[in-house]
Amino acid sequence: MGLDLYAKVEPYLDFEEEVYTLHKEFLRFVMVNELDNIIDIGCGQGYFLENLMVNKKRYFGIDLSVEQIKVCQAKNLNAKAIALKDVTEKFDCATAIFDVLNYIPKKELKQFIKETNLVLNQGAYFIFDVNSLFGFEEVAQGCITIDVDDKFIAIDANFEKNKLQTDITLFEKQENGMFSKESDSIIQEYHSKEFLTKLLKESGFEIVEIKEFNLHTDDNADKLIFICKKIA
């Protein structure tokens, strides 16, 4: 999966407002419930970790993308490029923000939720968001091109049979004036509220709340935020 290529183009995608809005929602829950000792799964370039650090929360971030973790470490954030199954510490809250669960194939999702359960203390929270069907069909699909500095970026996203394939192409101008080309794809899957509810309950979580959230549009909720608690 093209997560490392996505890490290269992410700074040019102009998602700052959406990042701020969604992170504010997660941080509000952390602060209101006085949560501490938090693991951020799929932490990306560490934007949410920075919020936790500013608010003097104990935190740890993990991501499978080495490129993303390099950015975190350049910011002196506590983050590692390791798989969830390799985490040995226990936490009082786990977050997975900005479609992390949509990147996980259906057949692997139950294992991911079980692994999340294993890194949490009893009574700990698991908070995550997923794209709604409206979010995939009406928001995520489409094409964009970005021409900036010495780079040209093309992104083409198509949603079909409950899967969103995003093709990313990056052209970068070299010192000799020629352009290099990198291409890769990212696959995301739609997970229904009913499917996620079933897996969570089977994996020892109680669902406290499922919130509809309008991130990109005022028309319909393009995201669902799950607030869960470990009970087994």
What are these regions (language model features)?
Residues 1-33, 35-44:
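Conserved class I S-adenosyl-L-methionine
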Residues 46-85:
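Class I SAM-dependent methyltransferase SAM/SAH-binding core
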Residues 85-94:
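A short acidic, Gly/Pro-enriched loop at the edge of an enzyme's catalytic core
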Residues 107, 130-194:
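SAM-dependent methyltransferase
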Residues 110-122:
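A short glycine-rich, Lys/Arg-flanked "PGG" loop and its adjoining helix->strand segment in the class I
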Residues 123-130:
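Conserved beta-strand signature within the Rossmann-like core of class I S-adenosyl-L-methionine
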Residues 203, 219-232:
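Core SAM-dependent methyltransferase catalytic element
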